[in-house]
């Protein structure tokens, strides 16, 4: 007789069949690796540790990044490579190629999507369309950018609010966003409109969700605080990949001199009761962001990773490095371009600029203010009127002889470090502390002595370090007729400075640690050369912006001499009459 299975065996088989059917019907968890960069700022070549010109240390560079990207693509199964904006602006590469270098090398590396940053608009819409948008094949995104009817050239069709990427059969939605303050920070023109990021991203996410997309990345360029708000407020976003604020996040001991502001990823509790990871990867291509997510039923159930430091332990890809060097050849003749003329000696010597007001410092700071004059309104003649620049960042004079010709390479000798001119918001107390710091080692030819524009400062060097500031007056910005007013410790001021001291260089840690806001700008070379081109002939003077007094009750020496001369003249005049 055939064997009849027992009831218990029959039940076990049925249960096993049911479990198998359930297992086959249930999708397995999906792992996604997100590699990301932000605020690369034209760092095509390798840099030093502080993202300036590479002399001894070796970090970053597109050829080094490519090596690590290829390694991770070979190791991990599902990989996306994303950029959160500001490929433009930051080195002589952008000054010369105007964005063509960004298009070429970001295309060569094979990015999957990019958000528009504010600096992508530094040369207007035409400077974004060509050479960049017309020469890349991946989607360029911004959900909160709208074009007015009168916009010429039209950008319609060259960027999108969002895209859907296919990663081994899984649909991943990516929504872009750009700082709504771009009209103040860059030059997009009057017909490009930057709307509220949160509302625009939510609208686009809702569209993707209605299409059945359940894995959505917000990719944008509005700064860490806005990134966190998007994670909190926007329903349906699973991860936020940001930029603009150059935020360094890291879990564990940091691998370099950069101090993390929080763990990587930074976790935000959303209003719809989820935990959303937020990431940035510092700036300048120094790190490659690495975030590994595990999705189950459209929800992130695991997140791990850390930015990868791209230092000399990672070999530069030889093929891409050869391409970099080929493009670099064209930069050599760029230094011979004549940009203007000086009829006075531009004193950029160490002795002068590290110990007293120097006219080279005045020229540089005046150029920095001029570069930021845009969009005045009924209250502000300019959004910033104060500049500080450390004397140690000025490395050479320019002679007025030989017809006073100023070439690009002349300026490169003055400003060799490739810094950017950045916008900060600080309290008056922070600015006062910076000036006290600037003279704490006065007389030792150290680099922290500050050159200025829009400031009149008095020091008493007989006081102990840390209390040598006697008086600071600042040029008002919220006024119709600019005039000097006493610095108020509890008032918030906008200032322009270079990226080196903005990041705490030369001991200016208060500018890094106490700033309320930070926006990266154009290169120092491009700012000063544009100013000289506009002026054609320059003749900066020493104007009494920085004075030394004997004590707080003593008039500045220069003003005392003027007063005595005026008194002698009046005495003579009255006597003769």
Swiss-Prot record:
GO molecular function: 5'-nucleotidase activity; metal ion binding; nucleotide binding
Record SUPFAM superfamilies: 5'-nucleotidase (syn. UDP-sugar hydrolase), C-terminal domain (SSF55816), Metallo-dependent phosphatases (SSF56300)
GO cellular component: plasma membrane; side of membrane
Reaction equation(s) it catalyzes: a ribonucleoside 5'-phosphate + H2O = a ribonucleoside + phosphate
Binding site for Zn(2+) 2: 86, 118, 221, 244
Subunit structure: Homodimer.
Name used for this protein in its record: 5'-nucleotidase
């Amino acid at each position: 007789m055939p064997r009849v299975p027992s009831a218990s065996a029959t039940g076990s088989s049925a249960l096993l069949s049911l479990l198998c059917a359930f297992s086959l019907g249930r999708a397995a968890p999906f792992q996604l690796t997100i590699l990301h960069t932000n605020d690369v700022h034209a760092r095509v070549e390798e840099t030093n540790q502080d993202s300036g010109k590479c002399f001894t240390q070796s970090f970053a560079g597109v050829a080094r990044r490519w090596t690590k990207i290829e390694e991770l693509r070979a190791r991990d199964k599902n990989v996306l490579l994303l950029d959160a904006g500001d490929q433009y602006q930051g080195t002589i590469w952008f000054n010369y190629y105007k964005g063509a270098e960004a298009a070429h090398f970001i295309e060569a590396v094979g990015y999957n999507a990019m958000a528009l940053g504010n600096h992508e608009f530094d040369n207007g819409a035409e400077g974004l369309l060509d050479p960049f948008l017309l020469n890349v094949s991946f989607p360029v995104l911004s959900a909160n950018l709208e074009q007015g009817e009168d916009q010429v050239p039209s950008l319609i069709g060259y960027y999108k609010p969002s895209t859907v990427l296919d990663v081994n059969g899984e649909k991943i939605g990516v929504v872009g966003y750009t700082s709504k303050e771009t009209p103040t920070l860059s030059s997009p023109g009057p017909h490009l409109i930057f709307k509220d990021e949160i509302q625009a991203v939510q609208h686009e996410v809702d569209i993707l969700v209605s299409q059945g997309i359940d894995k959505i990345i917000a990719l944008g360029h509005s700064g860490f605080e806005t990134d966190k708000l998007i994670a909190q407020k926007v329903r349906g976003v699973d991860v936020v990949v940001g930029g603009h604020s150059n935020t360094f996040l890291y879990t564990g001991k940091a691998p370099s001199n950069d101090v993390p502001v929080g763990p990587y990823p930074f976790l935000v509790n959303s209003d719809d009761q989820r935990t959303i990871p937020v990431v940035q990867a510092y700036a300048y291509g120094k790190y490659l962001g690495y975030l590994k997510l595990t999705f189950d039923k459209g929800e992130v159930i695991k997140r791990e990773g850390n930015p990868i430091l791209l230092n000399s332990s990672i070999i530069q890809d030889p093929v891409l490095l050869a391409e970099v060097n080929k493009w670099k050849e064209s930069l050599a003749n760029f230094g011979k371009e004549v940009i203007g003329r000086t009829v006075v000696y531009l004193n950029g010597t160490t002795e002068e600029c590290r110990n007293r007001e120097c006219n080279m410092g005045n020229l540089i700071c005046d150029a920095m203010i001029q570069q930021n004059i845009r969009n005045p309104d009924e209250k502000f003649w300019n959004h910033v009127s104060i500049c500080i620049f450390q004397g140690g960042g000025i490395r050479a004079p320019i002679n007025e002889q030989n017809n006073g010709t100023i070439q690009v390479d002349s300026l490169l000798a003055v400003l060799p470090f490739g810094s950017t001119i950045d916008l900060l918001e600080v309290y008056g107390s922070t600015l006062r502390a910076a000036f006290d710091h600037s003279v704490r080692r006065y007389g030792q030819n150290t680099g922290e002595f500050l050159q200025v524009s829009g400031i009149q400062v008095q020091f008493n060097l007989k006081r102990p370090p840390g209390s040598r500031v006697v008086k600071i007056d600042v040029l008002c910005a919220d006024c119709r007729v600019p005039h000097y007013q006493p610095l108020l410790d509890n008032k918030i001021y906008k200032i322009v400075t270079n990226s080196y001291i903005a990041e705490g260089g030369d001991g200016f840690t208060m500018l890094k640690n106490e700033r309320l806001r930070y926006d990266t700008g154009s290169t120092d070379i491009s700012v000063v050369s544009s100013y000289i081109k506009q002026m054609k002939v320059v003749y900066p003077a020493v104007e009494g912006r920085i004075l030394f007094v004997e004590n707080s009750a003593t008039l500045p020496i220069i003003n005392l001499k003027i007063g005595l001369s005026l008194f002698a003249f009046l005495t003579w005049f009255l006597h003769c009459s």
